[in-house]
């Protein structure tokens, strides 16, 4: 997910995206805790995507 793609989205769409990413992160953490996670790099990607979305939400709130 690129920051440019996210910048084009509205605040509502970003909030929806954030909820989806948080759910995905939760599922990945549960898989990791259970020893079933094969692709551990996905956790890092999702965490960074969450940070991107939160950063853009803060930027839009301040503007």
UniProtKB/Swiss-Prot annotation:
<dbReference type="InterPro" id="IPR001854">
    <property type="entry name" value="Ribosomal_uL29"/>
</dbReference>
<dbReference type="GO" id="GO:0003735">
    <property type="term" value="F:structural constituent of ribosome"/>
</dbReference>
<protein>
    <recommendedName>
        <fullName>Large ribosomal subunit protein uL29</fullName>
    </recommendedName>
</protein>
<dbReference type="GO" id="GO:0006412">
    <property type="term" value="P:translation"/>
</dbReference>
<dbReference type="InterPro" id="IPR050063">
    <property type="entry name" value="Ribosomal_protein_uL29"/>
</dbReference>
<dbReference type="GO" id="GO:0022625">
    <property type="term" value="C:cytosolic large ribosomal subunit"/>
</dbReference>
<dbReference type="InterPro" id="IPR036049">
    <property type="entry name" value="Ribosomal_uL29_sf"/>
</dbReference>
<comment type="similarity">
    <text>Belongs to the universal ribosomal protein uL29 family.</text>
</comment>
<keyword id="KW-0687">Ribonucleoprotein</keyword>
<dbReference type="InterPro" id="IPR018254">
    <property type="entry name" value="Ribosomal_uL29_CS"/>
</dbReference>
<dbReference type="Pfam" id="PF00831">
    <property type="entry name" value="Ribosomal_L29"/>
</dbReference>
<keyword id="KW-0689">Ribosomal protein</keyword>
